[in-house]
């Protein structure tokens, strides 16, 4: 009927005819009939197949099964199945675009789909109610396209495993509702738009096509193409439906409410609906259209809220963070990469820009692998004048070129100390270094490393150069080194930390001791080139002059030997034999860089009579340009020093005594040879650490037998947390400072590790060459294990924080350390019945909590915290009433007393290493027992554990200062008179013994608030600072100086608080790592054997004091008897007068 009606029309006169309802129904019903009939057929077939399978299972081998398994039929069936399988595999390869033909096929289908959609756009310009005649050239083209779609649909149908699931797929529905109407149009010789708008859903395959064409490669481009395809396909499809129903009207009203709306207007309406903004100029009038708009609005809320902001972010990030940094000539900048997070960036900027915000002209370029978060963006905006963020990776040369790393002053690599896998973090940062060095070998690198054993890879990079400023900041090495120094010298951990912590928060304490502590926190380690007028003078002379005239505390210098193979490096408190040369770098403890510039400006001519430090400025006189210092100037300087000494001491200067440096050096060598005669083969090849043969783990593992207690005394207990799966923390870095060779073998304290045997077994291969180390399997949370280690008589208990766990709460990372501190702190020890010398009533305990009014004391504890904000838990256990109410760790009472440590401040060392890497080298030397970057360059790792080759190398390695804590009354400091102020003590100890005093450890004066007699640290007191009789003094003590006086044996037993005291050990064993017996044994007290002979030189001033024979004999008699030869040599030395030989000093290593 439809065909007859169409044939009666004249095509030339009526190219666009009106489509009747019957024609439109024919187009739509063809699609619905195809869809539902096919679905019903598939369902019926599946039901029949399942029934047959079920019947075969019930009946077993039936007639049908016999037919398939019989002879020729069975073989033909197998061949057909094989052919079908191969055919199906080929089709799947084509459809998955794994082959070139398959890729062409997929791309062709997408292109033809877009072509069919374009034809729909062209035909949509005609009214929906009209039908196109076959004279329209687009109809045959669209018919060809749909014929190809039919072929592709058949291939997909045959390759589908689940036919029903395939039939209900979106692409299948698109084909079913667009292909059949095309063939109906061929039969009716007319075409109608119908549901052809569904072809727009093929746009969802746009990301796949672009990936096949390799047009997109990055994740951002893939994400953007996916979002774009979703939005476009949704808009075009929804606009097509609105265009259809609005132009056709509601079917039950027979189109009476229809409106003439173009496809463009439909898209406009859909976009306005998607943005949830309706302008009202174009609206839906039909019920179907309005119902669709209601549901589409809900879907638009999800679409617009989720996808549009992400697209805007992609566009914004692309413009903001993917550009290149323009390196301007004359503009300095650094590149920072690695762990770019809110915490790391905040810590770095705070330290890099501290106190210099108006002076810094160095820009910071952050190279981050992920776009910054909103919080991080806010930080960058706050420091907009200094920071730039570039999105990229240090592993890619293209990104390194974008940040112009070859023009940067340095490249700083930040590590994440709280990561769960520290080894992986180190390896990734080392790979960044390798990438940067391969890109530009001259770029200066400063890298943070978490585990010390990963440091060895960096110097092996061919372009790594220590001399140009390449540096390594090892968290494990420094952190555990600080804790080890706190175990050796109570309070030293806080003393050293305060020199590198910058406090910007102003606190106004009321108590006097708090004011002293906070004022001392202003002192920092600063460097300055020394004035050429100091050339030719000894270090004690320069240190004394700087202290008295400039109020500067000089503690170390950078020494460069005149010989090619001589020692070059930093020396702490060098002996008088070391002479200051021109352009020597000095290390000071001072408050501001302005103060230390006085050491550069000092002129022996202009400042000869100047006694006010502020008046020592750059004089600019001609004498400063002289190449050599003249004798009159030296004499003038000596005369000035005499006057200052008399002014300070209030006494006439002692008579001048000259002695031969060569003879003193020989005597020192003889004395040391006697001291190390028994263990000269027990140091490593560098002479820096005590060494022993590898010891098996079983031999040092302490067995628990009943209620036994090992008779350790004056030992160090280290509480370790971890299991077999925990990352190693590098306990070797904790042991090395405790086994430094500048302590004699008798001074070494036993180390007892309490922890999991599975964990400590993994660490043991790095510890088995160190003597006197023991392992007690157990847990520090169990008091029974603590008692077994005889913790009551230990000199210090270090509670080490456990290795970080994956996805751990930052507040809970210190749970074990806090609970262990609580357990150990609750131990009450009866001091009246304790035979240990650690209970001294004459000298109150520095951290042992002993009180004269109480018979109980507490175990000295040093706790490590990973999260500094957890300090308030430790403050509650401190035993001090009215402590500093601060959440800042470095303003807490626990920190001021030296009972807590956190490595969080190590982040600031990046800025320190960039501005002045010499300060970092000094810190490494102080906390690691003498290891510096210069030593690491020359030491072969395989030889570190070897035996020292000779006594000469041994002595040169050992002959370095050690940090100690001395009493004003029970040590040789009692010979300093007067000693009422710190300035008098400094000059006297330096003159008499070469001991450099750097700080105080004072008892908190409020006794009612300090029942345990805790002490606090005072860093670099003022020259006029009044001393108290109970003060302990932080000192840099020469190796050849013994510090203890013992007129009677009982006095030594009263000196427990004096650090560097001889270790109280059990009876001597042939094996140094043999654990002490459980039974009680007779204990022997040892005292160090050193020379008391004063060091003198030709440029003598009040420090040169003649020691009479009776005093020498008195001092010598207080020590363990020397060998006959050593005694005779000592007596000879004390009576002789020598001339100076400046080259007799054996340079320290």
Swiss-Prot record:
Q: What keywords tag this UniProt record?
A: Cell membrane, Cell projection, Cilium, Disease variant, Flagellum, Ion channel, Ion transport, Membrane, Potassium, Potassium channel, Potassium transport, Transmembrane, Transmembrane helix, Transport, Voltage-gated channel
Q: In which tissues is it expressed?
A: Testis-specific.
Which residues does the entry place in the Cytoplasmic compartment? Answer: 46-101, 160-163, 210-226, 313-1149
Q: Which residues lie on this side of the membrane: Extracellular?
A: 1-24, 123-138, 185-188, 248-259, 283-291
Q: Where in the cell is it found?
A: Cell membrane; Cell projection, Cilium, Flagellum membrane
Q: Which residues lie within the membrane without crossing it?
A: 260-282
PROSITE patterns found in the cross-reference section: RCK_N (PS51201)
Illness the protein is tied to: Spermatogenic failure 79: An autosomal recessive, male infertility disorder characterized by asthenoteratozoospermia with acrosome hypoplasia, disruption of the mitochondrial sheath, and reduced progressive sperm motility. The disorder is due to an abnormal acrosome reaction and impaired membrane potential after capacitation.
Its assembly, as annotated, is: Homotetramer; which constitutes the activated potassium channel. Interacts with LRRC52; this interaction changes channel gating properties, such as shifting gating to more negative potentials at a given pH.
Q: What is this protein called?
A: Potassium channel subfamily U member 1
Q: Which organism is it from?
A: Homo sapiens
Q: Which gene encodes it?
A: KCNU1
